[in-house]
């Protein structure tokens, strides 16, 4: 079984040997060393294979971002499909050097056990805005299908701030008001990282250096929240999955104010950290945000050949 597993992994990794754009490995780690780490798995340990015959597979689909764009909701909804096996945690393989340096063998161990017919999906929102990641993923599998969920850039900035704020509050640490982070000397603080993460055009250009647009499906995060079923149908078609998810899998929870999931008669909602109210922001500051993102948004629309209902 170990030999069969290794053969499958090497088949996925094979493009590394012939492609003209090799990955940018961590310091001191060469491309062949990455392959070697896949080849050398412990003998007779059963690693990568369960007693029921299921195996761990490298992902055929990755949700690459964007942070605070709705990636968790997308993964949970996609997991309703019986032919999808999703990694439970964010792996951060391609963007964290301490993980990437351990090679594809380590990455494989982070994947869920799945049947041969299932599609393995991994989600790490930081991938979209990490410069090295597109080339590294392409080196692993140039035909992989990528999912990118985006929302209104200004709203994404506010959600980004809200998450960090709550993280600080839980640790009883102070955190400045959003106005102090967004503004500097009467102007937008362009060094604020949350702003950069919402410049979708710049990040998308980097991905299109390595993947054709047809390999990247953009999910409208705002529509996914308002009416999830049509957006998930598009994802099913993009991934060439049979249409198994239906409208009855979603119901609107009036208490929470957003859609929850119904799977095999069991209801479940996203974690309470999802859908938090954003802080009150001066309308003039919001106008500055909308103005700042206006031109980058137009460039993004032209780049991907579609528009979104953003400010």
Swiss-Prot record:
<dbReference type="InterPro" id="IPR037359">
    <property type="entry name" value="NST/OST"/>
</dbReference>
<keyword id="KW-1015">Disulfide bond</keyword>
<protein>
    <recommendedName>
        <fullName>Heparan sulfate glucosamine 3-O-sulfotransferase 1</fullName>
        <ecNumber>2.8.2.23</ecNumber>
    </recommendedName>
</protein>
<feature type="glycosylation site" description="N-linked (GlcNAc...) asparagine">
    <location>
        <position position="253"/>
    </location>
</feature>
<feature type="binding site">
    <location>
        <begin position="274"/>
        <end position="278"/>
    </location>
    <ligand>
        <name>3'-phosphoadenylyl sulfate</name>
    </ligand>
</feature>
<keyword id="KW-0732">Signal</keyword>
<keyword id="KW-0333">Golgi apparatus</keyword>
<keyword id="KW-0325">Glycoprotein</keyword>
<dbReference type="Pfam" id="PF00685">
    <property type="entry name" value="Sulfotransfer_1"/>
</dbReference>
<feature type="binding site">
    <location>
        <position position="151"/>
    </location>
    <ligand>
        <name>3'-phosphoadenylyl sulfate</name>
    </ligand>
</feature>
<dbReference type="GO" id="GO:0015012">
    <property type="term" value="P:heparan sulfate proteoglycan biosynthetic process"/>
</dbReference>
<feature type="glycosylation site" description="N-linked (GlcNAc...) asparagine">
    <location>
        <position position="52"/>
    </location>
</feature>
<dbReference type="GO" id="GO:0006024">
    <property type="term" value="P:glycosaminoglycan biosynthetic process"/>
</dbReference>
<feature type="signal peptide">
    <location>
        <begin position="1"/>
        <end position="20"/>
    </location>
</feature>
<dbReference type="InterPro" id="IPR000863">
    <property type="entry name" value="Sulfotransferase_dom"/>
</dbReference>
<comment type="function">
    <text>Sulfotransferase that utilizes 3'-phospho-5'-adenylyl sulfate (PAPS) to catalyze the transfer of a sulfo group to position 3 of glucosamine residues in heparan. Catalyzes the rate limiting step in the biosynthesis of heparan sulfate (HSact). This modification is a crucial step in the biosynthesis of anticoagulant heparan sulfate as it completes the structure of the antithrombin pentasaccharide binding site.</text>
</comment>
<feature type="binding site">
    <location>
        <position position="259"/>
    </location>
    <ligand>
        <name>3'-phosphoadenylyl sulfate</name>
    </ligand>
</feature>
<dbReference type="GO" id="GO:0005794">
    <property type="term" value="C:Golgi apparatus"/>
</dbReference>
<dbReference type="InterPro" id="IPR027417">
    <property type="entry name" value="P-loop_NTPase"/>
</dbReference>
<feature type="binding site">
    <location>
        <begin position="68"/>
        <end position="72"/>
    </location>
    <ligand>
        <name>3'-phosphoadenylyl sulfate</name>
    </ligand>
</feature>
<dbReference type="GO" id="GO:0005796">
    <property type="term" value="C:Golgi lumen"/>
</dbReference>
<feature type="glycosylation site" description="N-linked (GlcNAc...) asparagine">
    <location>
        <position position="196"/>
    </location>
</feature>
<feature type="disulfide bond">
    <location>
        <begin position="260"/>
        <end position="269"/>
    </location>
</feature>
<comment type="similarity">
    <text>Belongs to the sulfotransferase 1 family.</text>
</comment>
<dbReference type="GO" id="GO:0008467">
    <property type="term" value="F:[heparan sulfate]-glucosamine 3-sulfotransferase activity"/>
</dbReference>
<feature type="glycosylation site" description="N-linked (GlcNAc...) asparagine">
    <location>
        <position position="246"/>
    </location>
</feature>
<feature type="binding site">
    <location>
        <position position="159"/>
    </location>
    <ligand>
        <name>3'-phosphoadenylyl sulfate</name>
    </ligand>
</feature>
<keyword id="KW-0808">Transferase</keyword>
């Amino acid at each position: 079984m170990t030999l069969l597993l290794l053969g499958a992994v090497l088949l996925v990794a094979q493009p590394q040997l012939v492609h003209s754009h090799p990955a940018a490995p961590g310091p001191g780690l060469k491309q062949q060393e990455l392959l070697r780490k896949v080849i050398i798995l412990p003998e007779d340990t059963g690693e990568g294979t369960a007693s029921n015959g299921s195996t761990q597979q490298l992902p055929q689909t990755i949700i690459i971002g964007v942070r605070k764009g709705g990636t968790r909701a997308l993964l949970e909804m996609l997991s309703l499909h019986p032919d999808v096996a999703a990694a439970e945690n964010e792996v951060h393989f391609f963007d964290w050097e301490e993980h990437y340096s351990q090679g594809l063998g380590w990455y494989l161990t982070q994947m869920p056990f799945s049947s041969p017919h299932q599609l393995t999906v991994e989600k790490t929102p930081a991938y979209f805005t990490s410069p090295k990641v597109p080339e590294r993923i392409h080196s692993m599998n140039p035909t992989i299908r990528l999912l990118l969920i985006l929302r209104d850039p200004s709203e994404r900035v506010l959600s980004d701030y809200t998450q960090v704020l709550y993280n600080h509050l839980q640790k009883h640490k102070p955190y400045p008001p959003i106005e102090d982070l967004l503004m500097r000397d009467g102007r937008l603080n362009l060094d604020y990282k949350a702003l950069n993460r919402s410049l979708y055009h710049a990040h998308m250009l980097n991905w299109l250096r390595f993947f054709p647009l047809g390999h990247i499906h953009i999910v409208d995060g705002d529509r996914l929240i308002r009416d999830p079923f049509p957006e998930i149908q598009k994802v099913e078609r993009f991934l060439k999955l049979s249409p198994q998810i239906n409208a009855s899998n979603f119901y609107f929870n009036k208490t929470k104010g957003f859609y929850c999931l119904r799977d095999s008669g069991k209801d479940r909602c996203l974690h309470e950290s999802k859908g938090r109210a954003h802080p009150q922001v001066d309308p003039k500051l919001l106008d500055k945000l909308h103005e700042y993102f206006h031109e980058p948004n137009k460039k993004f629309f032209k780049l991907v050949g579609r528009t979104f209902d953003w400010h």
